Structure formats: C-alpha cells, structure tokens
Amino acid sequence: MKKKKIKNPLIRRIPRELLGDWKKYLVVALFLILTIGFVSGMYVANESMLVAANEGVTKYKLEDGHFELDKKADETLLAAIETGTKADVKQYYLDKAKKELDEKLDEKAYPEAYDKAWDKIVEEIDDKYADEEEKYELNDPDFTEVPVKVYENFFRNEEEDYNNDGEAEGNIRVYAKNDNVDLACLLDGAFPEKADEIAIDRMHADNVGVKVGDEISVSGQRFKVVGLIAYVNYATLHEKSTDMMFDAIKFDVAMVTQEGFDSLHKTVHYSYTWNYVDIPADEVEQKAKSDDFMKALLTQVVCADKELEDYMPRYANPAINFATDDMGSDKAMGGVLLDILIVIIAFIFAVTISNTIVKEASTIGTLRASGYTRGELVRHYISMPVIVTLLAACVGNILGYTVFKNVVVGMYYNSYSLPTYQTVWNPDAFFKTTIIPVVLMLAVNLVVIIKMMRHTPLQFLRHDLKKTKRKKAMRLPKWSFLSRFRLRIMFQNVTNYLILFVGIWFIGIMLAMAVGMPETLGYYKSNVSDMMFTNYQYVLKSYENEDGDIITTGNKDAEKFNMTSLQHKSDTLDEEISVYGIEDDSRYVKISDLSALKGNEAYISASYADKYSLSVGDTVVLDEKYENKQYEFEVAGIYDHSQTLAVFLSNEQYCEIFDMDSDAFTGYLSDSEITDIDEDEIATVITEHDITKMCDQLDHSMGSYMTYFQYLCILLSAVLIYLLTKLIIEKNENAISMTKILGYENREIASLYLLSTTIVLVVIDVVSVILGVVIMKAVWRIMLFLQWMVRFSHKHDGLCENVPVYPDRISACHGIGFQKNQAYSDGSGTEKCGITGKI
C-alpha cells in the first residue's frame, strides 16, 4: 500500500491568518490594487492609443510633410517636384537676367555697353549664388534624389462663431473633403455630403459644447455640424508650428465638401503634402530625406517663379508628434511611481512579518526543534506578502484593462484629438505591474525574513532575537510617567516611523505637485503681463520686403529688436539661451547703461544668473546649435525684470557680434497693435493671449484630474498611517495588557499610543515639507518650470529641437536673387523662438 504524503500543517495557518487580520490585509490589498490598476490602465491605454496612432499612419494616409506656396502650382511644377531632383537655379537666373537685359538694351545697337552690363550681371549672380550655394548646401556631394508623391491639401483660415452670437470666438481651419492624404477618423455622426454641412474636431467640440446637429457660423456663413472627427495630422490643435502650446478652445479644424469650401471667402492657402516613394525606416532617415527634398524643392520653386511660404516635415510637426511623445513619457513616469510605492508597501510588510516573528518566537523555536528547516519557515512567512501582492496584481490588472484604462483614455481624449482605438494586450504592462511588484515584494521581505531566521531554536525559545543587548535602560528625562511612556514608545518604533516618514515625504511631494500645478497656472496667468516685455511682439520673416526695402512701421510705440538662440552646454544639460539685441534707451527693456557696453560685455537675466550661479564679472560661453561656433560674453550686470534665460546686448553690439548688417533686425516690440505691416511679412505675433492660452489648455485638460490626484495622495497617506499605527499597537500588545491590569482605562491607553504617533506624524510632516521644499527647489533650478512650460521647442529624439519652418530658405524664393535673412534665422534653416520663447 502506497504511503499517503502528509500535508504541511503550516499551510493551514495562511488562510487563518488572512481571516484573523483581514482588515490590515484588505487595506494593503486595496492600496496595491488602486496603484497597480491605475498604472496598468496607463500602460494599456498608452499601448492601445500608440498602436492606433501607428496604424493610422497607413489607415488615414498620414503625410510625410507639407509645404505651402504663394500661388497654386501647375502640373509641370508638381511633376518636377515629385522627381526629387534639383533644378539649375544659376542657369535659370542667367536666362532670366539675359531676357530682362535684352528688353532694356539692344545688343546690336550697343554691343560694348551690353557686354559690360552682362559681365557685371554674371559676376553678381556668381557671387550671390556662391553665398547661397554654401548656405543651403545646394551642391552637397551627399545629396540624393528623393522621389515623392505630392497631393493638394488646400485650406482656408476662417473665423468661428460656435454659439452664433455674432462674435467670433476663435479661428477654424477648413479643409475640403479628400480621399488622398491626411484623412480624418469619424468619431460621431457622418462626413459632410452637402455644401452647408461641416464636420469639426471632436476635442474642440467637447470643449465648447458643440454637438452633432448644432449649427455654427464660419465667417458669417451657417453650417450644420453633421460629424465630429479627428484629423490624423492634428493630434493636437497647433494653429502654427511655432505655437508654444496647442489650443483646442480657440482653434478648430474642420471638413466641408468641395462646394462648401468654394463658398467661403478667406484666402486659400495652397498647401501641398508629400509622401516619400521609399518609406523611411526611422526618424533619422526621415530627417536625411527631408533635408535632401528641401534642397530640391527650393530650386524647383524658385525656377517656377513661386515663393515657398511654409515647409514642415512630419518628424518636426508638433501637431503630429506632441501627443505620442507625451504618452510615451507618461508610461515611464507611471512605472517609476509604481515601483516606489511597491517598495514602501514591501517595507511595511517586512516590518509586519518581523513583528510577527518576534511575537511567535516560541512557536518558531518549537518548530525548529521539531525538525522544520529554515527554508520551510522562510517560505511560510514570505507567502503572505507574495499572495496578497499577486492577488492584488491580478485584480489590479483586470481593473486596469477595464475601469482604469477608460479613465486614462478619457484623460487623453480630454487633451488630444485622437482616433478610435482597440484595446490591445500589453505584455509590458503585465511584466511591470505583476512580475516586478511580486519580485520587489519577494526581495525586500526575503532579506528581512532570512536575517530573522538566522537565530538558533534556543534563541527563539528564549525570545533572544536582538543582536545587540543594551546593558542598561536608556535614561529618560524626569517627566511624568505618561510622557516618559510615550517617549519610550517612540524609541521602540523608530523603524516603523522611518518607513512612515519615507512614505509621507514621497506622497507629500506628489501632493505638492497636484496642489501646486493649478495654483502655479493661476499665478502665471494673473502675472503674465508683468513677465512680458510688451503687449505685442512681432517677429518678421525678414527685415526686408520683396523689393529689398527695409520693413518699417508708423506706429510710434514700435521698437526694433534682435533675437537669436544659443546653447549653454554642460555635462548634464544643453539649454537654450535667448540672446536679445535691444535699442539704446529702450522703453521696454530698461537697462540704463546698455549703450555703454563694449566688446562682448552683456547683461544677463536674473533667472539665468540664479540658475547657473552667475555674477557680475563672470564669463558665459554659449554655442551655436547647428554650427561649430562659440560666443563668450562677460557679465556686466543683472537685469531683474525678465523671467527668461537671456542675454541682453545693444542692437549695435548684436549686429557686430553675429556678423549682421548694421540695419538688420528681427522684429518689433510694441505696446499697441501694428497695422501697417503686411501679414505676409510677419512670421508670428506674440501677445498675452498666446502665453495664457497654454495655461488655459493645461488647466482644462488636467485641472480636474489634479483634484482627483490630491484625493488619491491623501488616501494613500491615510492608508500608511493606519497600517503603521496598527503595527505599533500590535507590537505593544503585552505592554497594553499590563497597563490595563494596572487599572488604566481604554481612553488613557489610546492617548499613550495615538498621541505618540500623532506627535511623530506632526514632526514627520514638518520635516517632509522642509525636505520637499529643498528637493522642489533643486528640481526647479534644473528645469525652471516656467521655461519648459512655454518653450517653442519639441523634442524629437535629439534630431531637431526647434520647430524648423526654415524662414531663411523660404525667403530665398523672394525675387530673382536669394535674399539673406540674417535677422530671423540662424543660418541652419531653423526658426528662432520669439522674444517670449522662454518667459
């Protein structure tokens, strides 16, 4: 007869212990379920949305880039552009110059004068072409032809009146319905079929309260909203690529029929999108192809007597990339948050088990003496935290794929214009929200339990578990009995209070961020006028118009300024610094002795000085981003009335240092609107609205969730306090019994332990606040909240941090000769930030 295997009797203790202390384990489980569930939901939502976005590239025929011309291109030009080859610009200019010369001068009648004029023209064209050839690398030996497919994607910028009150609430960009490129995902209703029907962006509609069936006015013309859509090339509603923040409240994109498009009256923007014939493998190849295609496009456009108004490759388009980049960073943040909270809970479990082992020392000694091995006891005591964590991870993942996923998706849909998605299985979420928490819990508790189990059976039986024995009791102050009792409780539970401190400190920092963000946005909006130099800041495409004349204004408030962007490089961070050229005795940037600056002397902003600990007399070294050039500036003074990281020079100094024409400038500062400069000459206008709309959008997208996050932090703090207070009481069961025997009432006993914990908690809270302030200041100095909040730049894996609108290359298409746009460009084809680029 086969001998029946005897089950390990220790297994029976596990469910009994769970039921016996179910409140504690339930609180821990809920803590883990909420944390794991939310992070799991974040991973699942992220992956599902990113998969939908990646599939949308093909499904909705996303562009590889777009450009805009001043006039509609004919079939010949489009066919030439699609070849990806360069036109012979020099020969084109020679032919055109010869034609104009022939019209003005008869070669046969005045052969000598004709030859002399022609030689001079050739010389000028050679010199000018040589400069532009070097600047734009038109004869780059590594140039490769980039064949593309070009599609028309015209639009009109109209005014939107969504409540039909007769006043425009914002702008709406209207596209005609097409089936070729940059398609839209229909989220509600239907696509327009009639001339008076329109489909608008879903997120904008949610923000302003427009629903399917409502009517809106587009530049005074009524349209019926028949659908809510999400354009694949407008995941975020950036009206301009240089906008500091997308604006889904005062900017909208829409689709109408071709008849509806033709019925509108605003200027048509001749925008063309392209897709590469050979699909790039990654962003590195995208950038290489874009650079080559840009050179070919420039030459073809110039030779067709057209002007290039805008150029934007996909990899640098914030409207396409901002949302997906942000979702990727959320995953990393969620993973770190989960790991930290799991470690805190693991230490709570470790302290609990350590106390349990001390309490059950006699039982453990008996079991060890009866033949149970250390391994069996280690496995028994570690089973509880692992089982609770595993169950919590399973439940949390179930909730993550259902409830919390929808919460995170709702957050994204509240911020971005995203297409429909399908929930996808995410193995990364399972690994990071199930395997890693269990491993962390196992590792922390294993270390503690193995350390405790090193004692001999006799030491367990004698309750002799302390390695160091105090020869005599700690001498306490001559206070009352109850006060000394409370003090001894504090000393006996230092480990528990230390864990409580770490938990409260970490949660306190999160709570400070949750409370601080809305307050900071509110402060920023209410004080933005004090942070701006002027009410209006006009950045021009060039300081000269098409005829070569300097752009001027009759506005008496207007004041010229120069601006460029350099880098402050360090081992840890390359940070952009704005360098301004300001007029002497400026009414807007009031530096009294600016005109007295000589050579490389400069003023720097107080923010710059504070962040990098600079003072008068120090030397600042700044680098060009795309060129191997360095500039040294000697700090001559600190300018206190600027929140930007900036260097201030006189305009004369600026032009000399950056080798510019003496009359060159970037734009105008003005307290009143400038109305006598052609809109086509203006690259961007920065007003208070442009600054505050970013705050409005952030507040709208995240404000309500910050409130939820505050409640979550308070709940986590309450859970930690409950668990550790319960541990302290359990650890002192014998002492509590003795005080009861001595006649103390429950109220008095509670005051001993609860008051002790309360006192420690108050001290912990104060210390946590102080340390939190120190840490937040350190983070502040590194990131400067107001800087990342309003930068123009968008990160694209280090390939291109500034949005490249290429205004200097665009200006190359104005007139017969290439016009050098020194005032606005850094010569690399990358647009400069406006004067408030880093307020």
Residue ranges and their predicted role:
Residues G396-K432, V763-S828:
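Short helix-loop junctions at transmembrane helix boundaries
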Residues K2-A346, N355, V409, N414, ...:
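Membrane transport/envelope proteins' first extracytoplasmic loop
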Residues T666-L669, D678-R781, F785, M789-F792, ...:
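C-terminal transmembrane helical bundles of large multi-pass transporters
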Residues T352, L399-G400, A429-K467, E801-K838:
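C-terminal membrane-exit region of the final transmembrane helix in multipass inner-membrane proteins
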